[in-house]
């Protein structure tokens, strides 16, 4: 149930049905490199392109009813440093220097280098609920398969490892 697991293969659909990223790519082939807000409703990119601010949609919620907040964005970024997190993701997001909370629904991304793709890359970071996965003593790699709480349009109705998974809206 962990979309970033190093053990096994994530369940089909889990990454984009149960979990969400701040932005989603256009499904239209005529809009390459275009993204639209899923968890954010406004983006501010600095003129020098070294910082960016996301305004988090105040209506965004996780499947357990908790709101999606800046704390979840910061927590998700910090997961990239967890030794149990997937090393490919660490490499992919390495040029994002920091993610800092400005307010409950506003976060600032600071980039380590100038790279025109970094604003798009930030939009692809899966946002995990801090109140679920950030509990003291929880292991991102070991405890994740007990529960999958995400902000996506679906929840898991039932599953059996290696056999089936059923989603409900």
Question: Which stretches of residues belong to each language-model region?
Answer:
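N-terminal lobe/hinge region of extracytoplasmic solute-binding protein
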Residues: 1-47, 78, 149
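Short, solvent-exposed loop/turn elements at domain surfaces
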Residues: 1-4, 30-33, 63, 117-120, ...
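Extracytoplasmic
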Residues: 17, 38-40, 47-49, 68, ...
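Gly/Pro-rich hinge or "lid" segments in bacterial periplasmic/extracellular proteins
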Residues: 26-30, 124-169
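Aromatic- and charge-enriched surface segment that lines or borders ligand/interaction sites
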Residues: 41-86, 102, 108
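Surface-exposed binding/hinge segments that line
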Residues: 55, 91-135, 153-160
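Solvent-exposed loop/turn segments at secondary-structure junctions
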Residues: 59-61, 80, 114-117, 161-163
């Amino acid at each position: 149930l962990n979309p970033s697991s190093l053990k096994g293969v994530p369940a089909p659909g889990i990454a984009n049905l149960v979990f969400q990223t701040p932005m989603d790519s256009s499904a239209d082939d005529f809009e390459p490199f275009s993204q639209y807000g899923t968890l954010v409703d406004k983006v501010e990119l600095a003129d020098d392109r070294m910082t960016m601010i996301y305004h988090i949609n105040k209506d965004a919620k996780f499947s357990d009813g908790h709101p999606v907040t800046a704390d979840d964005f910061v927590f998700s970024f910090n997961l990239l440093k967890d030794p149990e997190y997937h090393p490919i993701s660490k490499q992919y997001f390495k040029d994002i220097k920091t993610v800092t909370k400005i307010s409950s629904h506003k976060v600032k991304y600071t980039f380590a280098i100038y790279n025109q793709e970094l604003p798009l890359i930030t939009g692809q970071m899966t946002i995990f609920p801090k109140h679920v996965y950030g509990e003291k003593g929880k292991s991102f790699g070991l405890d994740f398969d007990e529960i999958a709480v995400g902000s996506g349009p679906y929840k898991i109705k039932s599953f059996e490892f290696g056999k089936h998974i059923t989603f409900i809206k």
